[in-house]
Amino acid sequence: MKELKYILLALILFPLMGMVSACSSDDSEEDEYANWQERNDAVVNQWSNNSALRKIKCYTKDQTTGGTSNDYIYVEVLEEGTGTESPLFTDSVWVAYRGRLIPTTSYPDGYVFDQSYSGDFSWQTADMTQFCTGALVSGFTTALMQMHRGDRWRVHIPYHLGYGSSSKTSIPGYSNLIFDIALLDFWHPGETRPEFKSREI
């Protein structure tokens, strides 16, 4: 009878332990993005007050007024190129990029949701991706239209200039976006696409 009692007890406890484990996992995932909109709003305010970041107003916003902190992207220049021209809205570009969310407990450097290269960036080894300048979120497009060939920027984009309240695969709604962008080259409609392999800046 004692053996039967222990068997019955084990059958009762094991499912409960599984439920506790599952609940703990769910709670952890939920906590990762708890108060997500408020946290992202607070980060934008920090960017806005950081004098080390260059403020560039989004091309879609009224350029004659000051606007709000959500109307701007905030740029840290990692490398300055030698180019003097910038891509137009209708141009195509060769870029390398890495996109992250704001830091969280599990991802202190920010969760990487997309990237065209792995490891440390190198002009010689990074894979370049072709985009149409105007086909991206407005914050990314704004950055490209201010960059020159050879520039590498870290661009902080408020969610208002990203995907807004919408979720995109691994990007929750109300997510600010942080992109490392390297602009190798660009060309106008009708021009021959330049090659990028083995090129040096």
Question: Where does each model-flagged region fall?
Answer:
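C-terminal motif of bacterial Sec signal peptides marking the signal peptidase cleavage site
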Residues: 18-22
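Sec-dependent N-terminal signal peptides
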Residues: 7-15
